[in-house]
Regions:
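Multi-pass alpha-helical transmembrane bundles in non-GPCR membrane proteins
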Residues: 1-208
């Protein structure tokens, strides 16, 4: 059974971990935009921008949520925090679907639409009043993170043609980081487990 509230010390750790993630995200925006602009490809630039902004928004909302002390404000920010996770996951898929898989028939746009539709539905659910929805949302996060396996074969084909199989390994690593991290999420009745989940989330973002 999950804790309803985190202790002050735990919230400080939560702020520090995702505060570090926020700085990482801001740095990533600069690095990715420079890399994208150098390619001169508008698809690369646009998808990199979407990913960087979605990732950073996730860390920003989480940091503000955990830093809030007023119960009413914290409740409101919690919804934004959970919504941003859906956007973070969808943003992660954007470069793969609109750059790597765009010319692979259904796979690029099909996967892009599927993931972003799931994210929009997830955001909608995050603002609905539902009992015991945290575990359901975590399952949704996991399913979204691993839906890429349906496009595994075309991804491998693209990476082999472009001699960039290492990208696939990083992608798998990100999924493993997030999957292992959910163990700590479900164990957050124990102190500082939520902060540990944050670290795995940052590890996932570093891979992808």
């Amino acid at each position: 059974m999950r804790k309803q509230r985190q202790t002050h010390g735990e919230e400080v750790a939560n702020v520090l971990t995702h505060g570090a993630g926020m700085l990482f995200g801001l740095t990533a925006i600069v690095v990715l935009m420079i890399a994208g602009i150098r390619t001169g490809d508008p698809w690369v630039i646009g998808s990199f921008a979407v990913y960087a902004l979605c990732m950073t928004s996730s860390y920003v909302t989480s940091t503000f949520y955990h830093a809030a002390s007023d119960p009413k404000r914290k409740c409101q920010l919690r919804r934004w925090d959970h919504s941003a996770i859906y956007l973070h996951i969808a943003g992660t898929y954007t470069p793969f679907t609109l750059v790597a898989l765009r010319d692979e028939g259904f796979w690029g746009w099909g996967l892009f639409i599927t993931v972003w539709l799931a994210a929009v539905i997830g955001v909608w659910f995050s603002f609905r009043r539902m009992k015991k929805k945290d575990n359901l949302k975590t399952v949704c996060y996991l399913l979204m993170s691993w839906v890429v396996i349906i496009a595994f074969k075309p991804l491998i084909d693209v990476f082999q043609r472009t001699d960039s199989m290492y990208v696939l390994y990083w992608l798998i690593g990100g999924g493993l980081f997030y999957s292992l991290g959910t163990i700590f999420f479900f164990l957050d009745k124990y102190k500082y487990m939520h902060s540990a989940w944050h670290l795995f989330e940052i590890g996932r973002a570093s891979c992808r």
